Design a protein with these regions (language model features):
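Active-site environment of non-heme Fe oxygenases that use a 2-His-1-carboxylate facial triad
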Residues: 2-35, 40, 45-265
């Protein structure tokens, strides 16, 4: 697990796609730490399609296969403004949210707007140690999340923390933007909000935020059930265009096994 002194490792786009030994190193690091940056990628729209040979097929969502992020005054999503975007993960409104996200910076000519990432597992580990009762309620209390537009609707009612049979953390669902109103008469709602307040304070604490600038040709790859992403406010005095797409960790882990075994044939 890591906190604010963490810096992701960088891997060349060309080497990642063309050299199996580099792909093995990059994917292994990604699975272990939850984040890598691929640099020197083409600043060309839809280049994320080319990562399928290493990451597996793009995970389709209802809205767009590859999503464009730039300042647009006609949408409701805070990502399309120049305001600070707090740490979150995407599509908490899916029963199974995409487990990997790639954010490809095509152009970044604006001042400010550093990317922020948070190791959600580090936050939850510390919360579990300090306030086990908060951790327990967040692991069991179902929370509604919704994302929709004129044509599509996604809705999930799930706890924010996912555990396996051994009570190990296997997923973190966190999005203030998509979280919906909770029935005030629901059992344990007061305990939930007390725990949620503590969780929000930690997620937004400088203690956990790693910050760095994504330049043109950089692709930030995050393990989306673990790592939250966001950005600082920026001045919309130039062009800033980012594209993102989703993949699945199961496919990436499978590809790593194939890469390792193919070298032994």
């Amino acid at each position: 697990y890591w906190t604010n002194d963490f810096k992701p490792n960088y891997f060349s786009w060309h080497d990642f796609l063309q050299k199996d030994e580099i792909a093995i190193d990059a994917i292994s690091d990604f699975i272990t730490r939850g984040v890598i940056v691929i640099n020197d990628a083409p600043s060309i729209s839809n280049s994320l399609e080319e990562l399928a040979t290493r990451l597996g097929p793009i995970r389709e969502v209802l809205f767009e296969r590859i999503h464009n992020v730039s300042v647009d005054g006609h949408v409701y999503n805070i990502a399309h403004t120049s305001l600070e975007l707090p740490p979150h993960n995407d599509f908490a409104s899916y029963t199974w949210p995409p487990s990997v996200q790639a954010l490809h910076m095509l152009v970044n000519d604006c001042e400010g707007g550093r990317s922020t990432i948070v190791d959600g597992y580090a936050v939850l580990r510390d919360l579990r140690n300090d306030y086990p009762e908060h951790f327990d309620i967040l692991s069991n209390f179902a929370v509604p999340f919704r994302e929709f537009d004129e044509e599509n609707e996604t809705y999930a009612n799930e706890p924010m923390i996912r555990l396996n049979a051994e009570k190990e953390i296997t997923g973190f669902r966190y999005s203030n933007q998509l979280m919906q109103m909770i029935d005030p008469k629901k059992k344990n709602v007061d305990a939930f909000y007390e725990a949620y307040h503590e969780l929000c304070n930690r997620v937004n604490s400088e203690k956990y935020k790693s910050k760095f600038r994504l330049e043109s040709g950089h692709i930030l790859l995050v393990s989306a059930h673990r790592v939250l992403h966001g950005r600082e406010e920026f001045k919309p005095d130039g062009k800033r265009h980012l594209q993102d797409a989703y993949y699945e960790m199961d496919n990436i882990e499978n590809n790593l096994v194939l890469l390792k075994t193919s070298g032994n044939k």
